[in-house]
């Protein structure tokens, strides 16, 4: 089954060492020595993010210390903006994962959890069996190889919307935070500056239009998935019209969200 989200521990997973013991300045994260293994792993994760995989944090840590590293360490490849959601606290990690799934509105079975601790991996496997928990080798130099060997993130074609997905979840978090400043939803929606652009018989996004026909939710009245070639055939046909909508607001671009044949 294809997975949507990688949930990441921090200490000895995204960097070497433990912040609570080594301090934010004492962790291993550099382009030389042991720290280079974590740089390589972060780069592979960033590549996943840029292909549309959601990244989230699940760490038992003091949030102030952890965020100091993420925000200020010059060797961090992954920035705060790359994480769609965070749970940096002292709660059990299985509970954190359930909260992350709820916040992101995705299924537990679409998540993969990376943690260097065998104890944490065992706990999550038992308490949240829907989540995939790969064995992470003791040697950090093998982290990247382990990630790239997983079969869960393969895709037939990567669309612009796929590439944007990680950012879409980040901007959605910003919207939710902004909504708290409004007394009613109507005023909040007005503040978004929503703009919908409708395109007719445009062949520049056939991969995405075909992708939308594969959706299995209640908003798909077609129920017959189309290939990109079939979509293009409809666009070029004299007997059909193809319309699609792209939505933006002040926080960002939702991408192509609807198609009608």
Describe the predicted segments one by one.
Residues 1-169, 173-261:
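Catalytic cores of nucleotide-enabled group-transfer and carboxylate-activating enzymes in metabolic
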């Amino acid at each position: 089954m294809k997975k949507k989200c990688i949930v990441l521990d921090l200490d000895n997973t995204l960097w070497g060492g433990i912040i609570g013991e080594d301090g934010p300045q004492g962790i291993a994260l550099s382009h030389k020595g042991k720290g280079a293994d974590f740089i390589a792993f972060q780069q592979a994760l960033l590549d996943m993010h840029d292909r549309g995989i959601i990244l989230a944090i699940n760490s038992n840590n003091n949030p102030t210390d952890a965020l100091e590293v993420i925000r200020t360490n010059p060797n961090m490849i992954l920035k705060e903006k790359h994480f769609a959601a965070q749970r940096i606290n002292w709660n059990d990690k299985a509970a954190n994962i359930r909260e992350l799934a709820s916040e992101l509105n995705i299924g537990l079975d679409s998540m993969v959890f990376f943690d260097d601790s065998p104890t944490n991996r065992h706990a999550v496997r038992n308490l949240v069996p829907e989540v995939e928990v790969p064995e992470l080798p003791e040697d950090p130099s093998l982290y990247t190889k382990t990630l790239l060997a997983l079969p869960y993130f393969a895709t037939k074609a990567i669309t612009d919307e796929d590439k944007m997905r990680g950012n879409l979840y980040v901007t959605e978090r910003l919207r939710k935070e902004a909504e708290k400043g409004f007394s009613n939803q109507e005023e909040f929606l007005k503040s978004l500056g929503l703009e919908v652009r409708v395109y007719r018989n445009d062949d520049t996004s056939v991969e995405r239009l075909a992708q939308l026909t594969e959706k299995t939710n209640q908003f798909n009245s077609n129920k017959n998935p189309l290939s990109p070639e079939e979509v293009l055939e409809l666009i070029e046909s004299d007997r059909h019209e193809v319309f699609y909508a792209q939505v933006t607001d002040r926080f960002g671009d939702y991408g192509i969200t609807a198609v009608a044949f």
